[in-house]
Amino acid sequence: DVETGLKYVNNDACYPAIMVIGQLVDAILEGRYDPDHTALAITQTGGMCRATNYFGLIRKALVDAGYPQIPVIAISTQGIEDNPGFKATPALLHRVIKALIIGDLLMKCLYRVRPYEVTPGSANKLYKTWDTIVRETLEHHGHSKTAKRFIGKGYLPYPPLFRQIVTSFDALPLRNIPRTLRVGVVGEILVSYQPDANNHVVDVIESHDCEAV
């Protein structure tokens, strides 16, 4: 991601911007999405940092990478850019907010149990299962084939989905040991959460038998 970002973004841009744009362009270059049926969306705050300039940087990167047909949507209340053909409806914004909250829940559950798991890899496996279920429920208005196979319920509206995630992680077999030292990860928001950007600092913390928070 960093190498792709440096290739398509001038290196006077900040590190988080290079990382994010590299990720987005990489996803297209690797063939994970059809460039003729894909749009990229990014927030635009109206401030002076990358949060306003992402729009132009991403558009230029896509053109330079050979994908000028991919539209870039600026999600903003400032009205700096026009987004013809796109309308942020209340229903869409509601789904976006749900995705943000559930993503935070999944991360917190994973970090809380992974240092104590009985079977190595079991927490990551459970996380990936619920990540798939969440994606399906958001795309199909609460319905999930994976959830049907995993917990016997094919329909999970928002509140039950939350409860099922917590219940599932609570049931994961853990070692009967005292809670380990907790280490807080702080700093620039993107670098704090993106493993490649922070050199997998959470893995380093957990490798020293500590719990990342």
Residues covered by each model-derived region:
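An N-terminal assembly and electron-transfer interface module characteristic of large anaerobic redox
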Residues: 1-213
